[in-house]
Amino acid sequence: SEDCTPWTATPITVLAGCRDYVGEQ
């Protein structure tokens, strides 16, 4: 989530390495 894009990120970001963006705003 630290490397995540804002909550506007799409599930694609998960594949990019953003695993827990779903659990964070």
From Swiss-Prot:
Record PTM text: May exist both in a glycosylated and in an unglycosylated form.
Main location: secreted
Keyword terms: Alpha-amylase inhibitor, Glycoprotein, Secreted
Keyword Glycoprotein set for record: yes
Cellular component annotations (GO), alphabetically ordered: extracellular region
Molecular function GO terms recorded: alpha-amylase inhibitor activity
Compartments it resides in: Secreted
Complex formation: Monomer or homodimer.
Entry function: Inhibits alpha-amylases but not trypsin. Is more effective against insect alpha-amylases than those of mammals.
Sequence similarity: Belongs to the protease inhibitor I6 (cereal trypsin/alpha-amylase inhibitor) family.
Protein name: Alpha-amylase inhibitor
Record organism: Secale cereale
